[in-house]
Amino acid sequence: MLKAYKYRIYPNSEQRIQIAKTFGCCRFVYNQTLAYRREIYEKEKKSVSKTDCNNYCNRELKKDYEWLKEIDKFALTNAIYNMDVAYQKFFKEHAGYPKFKSKHDNHKSYTTNFTNGNIAVDFETGKIKLPKLKAVKARLHREYRGQIKSATVSQVSSGKYYVSILVETEHKELAHTNHNIGIDLGIKDLCITSDGKAYENLKIIKKYEKQLVKLQRQLSHKGKRSKNYYKTKKKIALCHEKIRNIRKDYLHKVSHEIISENQVIVSENLQIKNMVKNHHLAKAISDVSWYELTRQLEYKAKWNGRKYIKIDTFYASSQLCSVCGYQNPDTKDLSVRTWICPKCGAEHDRDINAAKNILTEGLRQIA
């Protein structure tokens, strides 16, 4: 299986210049090949493959722009392949048409492939060898076993540099368990399980969100492009990064616990893109990070021989009595948090009852 290990790197001034050049050249090649693809289609109504785009880069672009030859060839090829992935998504998944990349993008990255030992991690010296950069200082906080496949160098908006090493490695699956669980994704709580356990949303994030509001207010009073403007902007980026890291770490802990304790995990397949169009709920939905939680559950279930099922969005999990199956239309009102089934008299907590129904439906689908 493929697994990524992310490390912070500390490039020197010469290495930072080379990384910046690579970011710029990858962006340039991405934009040029996207424009070439569009032009050929408009003129000749002919589709252009990623191989055609790669040949165009090697034969035309590198001839006209000599400085492209100073950049790692795999990084340029992967930029073209990334453009092709975005292009294929436009046709197959009805995503938006690929956009041209801007040099002002907050997140910059490029990917290079392993060949003939050009990527190596030395845990003794705390350095990572990368094409065109040689040895880069790194914080190697955890070791790995396996064969390196690629490395992705990135720079986030706070200015920090990272490298993600993709490794082909063996993974020992978790021991089989007979316990199954249903999950009701919420806003007040991150999620509630069919066992009645509520995973709360982190309260500490509110502290950093207050800091963020204060910093954004300060930024609005700074002269644009002044030194203090950029200092405050960096503080804002660091605050965003802190919030993102706290949230992601918490989601990893929650998803690990759910996967470790259960063989079958069932949740709703929520259409988050459509839900955030409701401006009253958009921030709350983004804050609880349903997408990231379900993404983690999905890949961790595959790693560990678990079954993760998503049931239909429109399944009436909140309206059904989990004891007798009676459908109560009164529970369409979101303010109804507890109710008694008119048919069997069972008392229900709205969220726990929904989680039980979600589990029942998921198990029915795989029976």
Question: Regions from the language model: what does each represent?
Answer:
Residues M1-L76:
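Gly/serine-rich nucleotide phosphate-binding loop at the start of the catalytic core
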Residues Y7-I9, A135-A138, Y199-N201:
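Generic detection of short hydrophobic beta-strand segments and adjacent strand-loop junctions
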Residues T33, A79-F90, I352-G362, I366:
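Stable alpha-helical structural segments in soluble proteins, enriched in small hydrophobic residues
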Residues R142-Y144, S157-A367:
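Positively charged, helix-rich recognition surfaces that bind polyanionic ligands
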